[in-house]
Amino acid sequence: MQRSPLERANLFSKLFFSWTKPILKKGYRQHLELSDIYQIPTADSADNLSEKLEREWDRELASKKNPKLINALRRCFFWRFMFYGLLLYLGEVTKAVQPLLLGRIIASYDPDNAHERSIAYYLGIGLCLLFIVRTLLLHPAVFGLHHIGMQMRIALFSLIYKKTLKLSSRVLDKISTGQLVSLLSNNLNKFDEGLALAHFVWIAPLQVMLLMGLLWDLLQASAFCGLAVLVVLVLFQAWLGHRMMKYRDRRAGKINERLVITAEIIENIQSVKAYCWEEAMENMIESLRETELKLTRKAAYMRYFNSSAFFFSGFFVVFLSVLPSMLTKGIVLRKIFTTISFCIVLRMAVTRQFPWAVQMWYDSIGAIYKIQDFLQKEEYKTLEYNLTTTDVVMENVTAFWDEGFGELLVKAKQNDSSRKVSSDDKNLIFSNISLLGPPVLKDISFKIEKGQLLAVAGSTGAGKTSLLMMIMGELEPLEGKIKHSGRISFSPQFSWIMPGTIKENIVFGVSFDEYRYRSVIKACQLEEEISKFAEKDNTVLGEGGITLSGGQRARISLARAVYKDADLYLLDSPFGYLDVLTEKEIFESCVCKLMANKTRILVTSKMEHLKKADKILILHEGSCYFYGAFSELQNLRPDFSSKLMGYDSFDQFSAERRNSILTETLRRFSLDGDAAGSWNETKKQSFKQTGEFGERRKNSILNPLNSIRKFSLVQKAPLQMNCIDETLDEPPERKLSLVPDSEPGEAILPRSNMLNPGPVLRARRRQSVLNLMTRPSIHQGSSLYKKGSASARKMSVAPQSNMSEMDIYSRRLSKDSGLEISEEINEEDLKECFIDDIESTTSVTTWNTYLRYMTIHKKLIFVLMMCLVIFLIEVAASLVGLCLFKDGASRMNSTSNLNHTSTLDWFAVIVTNTSTYYMFYIYVGVADTLLALGFLRGLPLVHSLISVSKILHQKMLHSVLQAPMSTFNTLKTGSILNRFSKDMAILDDLLPLTIFDFIQLLLIVIGAVTVVSALQPYIFLASVPVVIAFVLLRAYFLRTSQQLKQLESEARSPIFTHLITSLKGLWTLRAFGRQTYFEALFHKALNLHTANWFLYLSTLRWFQMRIEMVFVIFFILVTFISILTTGDGEGKVGIVLTLAMNIMGTLQWAVNASIDVDSLMRSVSRVFKFIDMPTEEHRPTHPAKNKDISGVLIIENQHVKREKNWPSGGQMTVQDLTAKYLDGGPAILDNISFSISSGQRVGLLGRTGSGKSTLLFAFLRLLNTEGDIRIDGISWDAVPVQQWRKAFGVIPQKVFIFSGSFRKNLDPYGQWTDQELWKVAEEVGLKSVIEQFPGQLDFVLIDGGYVLSHGHRQLMCLARSVLSKAKILLLDEPSAHLDPITYQVIRKTLKQAFTNCTVILSEHRIEAMLECQRFLVIEENKVRQYESIQKLLNEKSVFKQAISHSDKMKLFPIHRRNSSKRLSRPKITALQEETEEEVQDTRL
């Protein structure tokens, strides 16, 4: 960044913002880069501002029992705030004085006041000076207030972030990520630009009092008639606003529904295409969109009438103000024109400035109190440790994760007089407190000495992770004693990668030791991986390590933990994403050798690990099931395998037990036993969803973290009703959310309290920060080119009879995200608060975009032409009326000099001729007609623009759904979703009304200039250069401002990225003590954004000031042209000066509106880009290499037409297949060929990332491919994409359950009857589950089917495949995250329902391969072997290296008696009781 010219600028340059000229000039001539931005002033640095506010807040906390954040802010910023407020007041006072001078100038042209004609020149000079003074006062004041608002936001940003890093885990469990993001975006954005309005809460009343005093002097009591009109107008606008908010609230729910479905579809686009559901999904979304648009139109009409009421109310205010005076004293032109000027200022103060100021204070005070409450939340308590301790001891520890339990626990401890703390060893000891709810850990005791390895095992939710959190101090024990040295290193279950290089992620701020670093790299098997990167360990990793595979992330996370020199290493399932060979090597070299002298606690379920551990702790439902050595385990606990692997799963419960479990599950999600309204009529069968839907989805839509959640179906804890829900208690303020677009999911969505009518739940489930920290990212398991292709390895979701650990983490069963869904779209700030990915677009919108936008809907051109015609009629009528009135009044003035009385003011002129009154009445009639025409002009325009938005959404949705997968591999998911959320919100809400305002203002200005020029032709000559100056200034500023806005948006992204990253790795940060380092990184991100935002504010003020300076010059010319060229008669000079004075504000408004239109049209440009995306049908398919198959295409096409039941056999031939994820990218599969016979079962083998999933995607034509694949002799070049994919049944890694009923999820096209659906549900084991839900098949699943276990969701996919009656079944690790029982159900179904089908299976488990006849081994992008299992075991292969002796025994039982005799395929009975070894998770 460059040094800012502001530091060496003089007073003149600062006053006129001339120091911004270099950046404006550079932005006009070339594209701006981040290096072109100026450094921020020292006073604006986040370090200084946060330190200042933190000091005052600490002072407030120390001095008072009831601290107030507003007091801390007052001590920091009050005096500067008041100084700029005083400047603003003085600038506004000049507006009230200007009409006085105008009245004197008009009066001087009365023939009776000829002796004052010479004073007119001085009055004109005074009027011009008032404009100059106002310009010099107003702009520095507004800029200063914006600057203070920016500083307040920065200081509060920092304060909130620092507090976030200190919050206790219990508090984090009750605060959603959406709330935190909302605190930093929704609430704090109010300070930036809103602070300039704050002073109008006292300026506007003073101004009204001053204006009413002046009007009283001019019109006496009739002045209050105009004020009464304004009060009525304000009440009318308030009523319109209330009506509009009702429509918007109802519409917000519909927007949520549409965006939920859209987000789910985009996030699962591979599944949508694999199932050929594009048309069904498109119809579903468009149906929701139609309902949404009906409410959008109603809300837009309300806002249109609100805006129009302001524009057209001016005439009635003036007319009713002067009417009583006119009827009693006659028409006095001076009074009329002076009243017009007074009323314009009065109208702005009453209807705009004061309401806006009140709203700003209301919102800001509410935001301050919310931030204050947040800053007073319970903090993470650092336990006191004994550094000389070498052992790790836990004695009789019991702890709770219960939701809403934090405050209860604190109060209980405070009130427990028997609580004692040992002063000897400074360890925490807690006494018994009787509380309801099952503890997550119950009476846990163990002791491990230095250098020992403790293996912690147990089923899902047993309390393994909670045990580690207890040791780290994240979970505070209710009772018991913990003892260790406190020097801890930690590797989380779901690897956390911070943005930075590989080296930075491993060293993580610890002092660098080359030898230790290299040893750790080698032990964690990272040497080969790092050597493949061009930059080696200096390769920069994106947020979450998106460019790495899940295994690579896991190893880097483990290396980070091992590199730190600690006494105790906590390793939470570090091998979850590794293939079995890598896992064995790392366990031996790293855990057993490199860390041999260190105390280690390893969470694992592998038998090999348990055998080598010094001590074993098996947890079951939070209790210690076993503690001791492995040799004791088999003797004392022969049933340990079921506890270890979660064999107590849902499917083993009796029917009565299952029924009670499901009933309890449903009860937790309903306020009462009644059903709520739903998406459609069938949704009445659903449980109560009101108020929960938006909260659940706010953390899943456009999700930068789009997690794979860990649920258990069963939770026995009672529904907590005291969960934090700030949104229920807060005022119904307008909100918006800001999520970084650098995240894979980013956008702002409207949030609604209601998906359907009904009461709001007091305890709405939301995604807690704790949940965010305890589940993987969407990218876990995916590689650089397999973006999102491999799901994270998830824990088994076997339900527990009591609330499990993972249940407690995810007790709200919500999908996660860092996104707050706003209740409605914030009209004022929406366009400012979205970040978008870096675009290589021009700095201004092209004319082609405008032309295409206007011509996409035929009626829009007609409406625009109608607007032009109505405008011409209005201008013509105005000219005729004004001329008649002016001339008539002038003639009467000359003949009525003797008719005035001495009781009137000495310069007043009374017009008593009756014809003049007729002229006035005619003018009133013309004005009423023009008012009606104005309403007629705007309403069709708004309606047509919303219709354009509808058409654009239809076209874009169709294009996206039909786009090839290569498009989705190159685009961020968030970028796509932003088009449907951010840009469609702009097209629906902001753009129509902004275009209307711009056209309305432009026509007003043109009309006023036309009238003034017609009355005084010389003024037209003066207006030409002024118009040219405006156009040039706008073009000059627009190029730079749009680039600065784009840079500012890009700079805003790291702030929220860093927040979410910090939250995800908060436990790691605390374990490593890196809070200060991350605070510094956050301040760096804040400073970067501040530099861009401050420069934008400065250049904006430069432009506004230049616009006003040009107008002041224009007004000076108009004033003196009028004074010098006007003879006797008040009419002409009155009209000219009044219109010229009031053109100023309108013209500035119009220029700003034009800039807003240009900015908003960039959304239209982005939408057009998506509309123009290529479609799959037109994507060329490359022929097989060295093969000319064109000669048989005609025959095959004819065959396809004849064979209606193709494919009939399922025989596949793959020839020279090459597959890539990106055009021009590396080949993931390179020139492979093989064939599969009809009905054959083939297993795919290979290490993680070898290309097994890629091959399945290639079969479905989801990748860029070359070569040929034939099914039953038909080439894929001869069959349309949709028909080709229908030949396959698919069970993907990533289960796709969209928000809809069971029926829709199984049969979105409605092809099957209920009987057929029930038959298939029974066949796959889902019938008993579906029957437990109200409505059964019509029960509505939301949020990815969170009420179902992962196994049940997998069975849904299996049911779809059965219904598809496909001849070829593709299974991509279907058992990766299943409990053993559900896995056996799938095996049974595959065996029975797909007997005659070709099955291609990618698996890690040996058991899953038992039914396969042949195996395809993929290594280094090629097919290495394609043989039977017997041949593979006789040859050197990955399979032979990975398989253990016990695995061979399972595959070949006879081998134990006679190794020379082998079975070609062992017989397996469904749901057989497996032995201890069979239960093991054996992976390849």
UniProtKB/Swiss-Prot annotation:
One of its GO terms (biological process) is chloride transmembrane transport. It catalyses: ATP + H2O + closed Cl(-) channel = ADP + phosphate + open Cl(-) channel; chloride(in) = chloride(out); hydrogencarbonate(in) = hydrogencarbonate(out); ATP + H2O = ADP + phosphate + H(+). Keywords: ATP-binding, Cell membrane, Chloride, Chloride channel, Endoplasmic reticulum, Endosome, Glycoprotein, Ion channel, Ion transport, Isomerase, Isopeptide bond, Lipoprotein, Membrane, Nucleotide-binding, Nucleus, Palmitate, Phosphoprotein, Repeat, Transmembrane, Transmembrane helix, Transport, Ubl conjugation. Residues 1-77, 147-195, 244-298, 359-859, 944-994, 1039-1099, 1156-1484 are cytoplasmic. Residues 1463-1484 are annotated as: Disordered. ATP 1 binds at residues 401, 434, 458-465, 493. GO terms for molecular function: 14-3-3 protein binding; ABC-type transporter activity; ATP binding; ATP hydrolysis activity; ATPase-coupled transmembrane transporter activity; bicarbonate transmembrane transporter activity; chloride channel activity; chloride channel inhibitor activity. Residues 81-365, 860-1159 form the ABC transmembrane type-1 domain. The modification Phosphoserine is found at residues 549, 660, 670, 686, 700, 712, 737, 768, 791, 796, 814, 1446, 1460. The chain crosses the membrane at residues 78-98, 123-146, 196-216, 223-243, 299-319, 340-358, 860-880, 923-943, 995-1015, 1018-1038, 1100-1120, 1135-1155. Residues 99-122, 217-222, 320-339, 881-922, 1016-1017, 1121-1134 are extracellular. It comes from the Eukaryota. It is found in: Apical cell membrane; Early endosome membrane; Cell membrane; Recycling endosome membrane. It is an enzyme of class 5 (isomerase). Binds and hydrolyzes ATP via the two cytoplasmic ABC transporter nucleotide-binding domains. The two ATP-binding domains interact with each other, forming a head-to-tail dimer. Normal ATPase activity requires interaction between the two domains. The first ABC transporter nucleotide-binding domain has no ATPase activity by itself. The PDZ-binding motif mediates interactions with GOPC and with the SLC4A7, NHERF1/EBP50 complex. Monomer; does not require oligomerization for channel activity. May form oligomers in the membrane. Interacts with SLC26A3, SLC26A6 and NHERF1. Interacts with SHANK2. Interacts with MYO6. Interacts (via C-terminus) with GOPC (via PDZ domain); this promotes CFTR internalization and thereby decreases channel activity. Interacts with SLC4A7 through NHERF1. Found in a complex with MYO5B and RAB11A. Interacts with ANO1. Interacts with SLC26A8. Interacts with AHCYL1; the interaction increases CFTR activity. Interacts with CSE1L. Epithelial ion channel that plays an important role in the regulation of epithelial ion and water transport and fluid homeostasis. Mediates the transport of chloride ions across the cell membrane. Possesses an intrinsic ATPase activity and utilizes ATP to gate its channel; the passive flow of anions through the channel is gated by cycles of ATP binding and hydrolysis by the ATP-binding domains. The ion channel is also permeable to HCO(3)(-); selectivity depends on the extracellular chloride concentration. This is Cystic fibrosis transmembrane conductance regulator. The gene is CFTR.
